[in-house]
A protein has these predicted regions:
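Bacterial N-terminal signal peptides that target proteins for export
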Residues: 1-9
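Sec-dependent N-terminal signal peptides
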Residues: 10-14
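C-terminal motif of bacterial Sec signal peptides marking the signal peptidase cleavage site
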Residues: 17-21
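A residue-level marker of the well-folded mature domains of exported/periplasmic proteins
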Residues: 22-165
Length: 165
């Protein structure tokens, strides 16, 4: 359930941005495709690997529902922030309409944000939330994922309940 909701949000956010014109270039009147750049911090992560497969499935569903072709460029950052920064540069140079980033280092999002702002490309960070100061820098940055504090409280409650039992 959580993966499906996360995938749906990840896919829907850039699509809505594009349809509302926030990712549109001035010279483009009508788009017949959406190009999304997706950088995943590490392929081997079981959850993220499942998420990748579901993103591809959601892209196919979206194409069938809207007739709009979805080009997904999904890459592995290999747990390297510098590799991920290079991937973002490449996505922007390819003309991606939106970026979906599973950030390697949540405290190093500023470089990605600056590049996206300069190119006017919205960014959806997922599963790992950048620091609040970075997220507040621009109104076209989004985060999809769990609230870490809330998750910790729930986990603590489960442990306490198990201990009391």
């Amino acid at each position: 359930m959580r993966r499906g909701l996360l995938c749906g949000c990840l896919f829907l956010m850039p699509a809505l941005c594009l349809m509302s014109g926030c990712g549109e270039k001035a010279e483009q009147e009508e788009k017949n495709s959406i190009r999304l750049g997706v950088s995943i911090y590490r392929w081997e992560d079981a959850f993220v690997s499942t998420l990748r497969a579901e993103l591809e499935e959601k892209a196919k569903e979206y194409e069938q529902e809207t007739g709009l072709k979805v080009v997904l460029d999904i890459v592995d950052a290999k747990e390297s922030q510098s590799v991920q920064n290079g991937q973002v540069e490449r996505f922007i140079s390819l003309g991606c309409d939106a970026l979906c980033i599973n950030i390697v280092d949540r405290s190093a999002a500023s470089d990605i944000i600056v590049r996206a702002m300069d190119a006017d490309v919205p960014v959806v960070f997922f599963n790992r939330e950048p620091v609040e100061e970075d997220m507040d820098r621009w109104d076209r940055l989004y985060y999809v994922g769990a609230d870490a504090k809330e998750s910790a409280v729930i986990q603590g409650t489960i442990l306490a309940d198990a201990y009391d039992a």
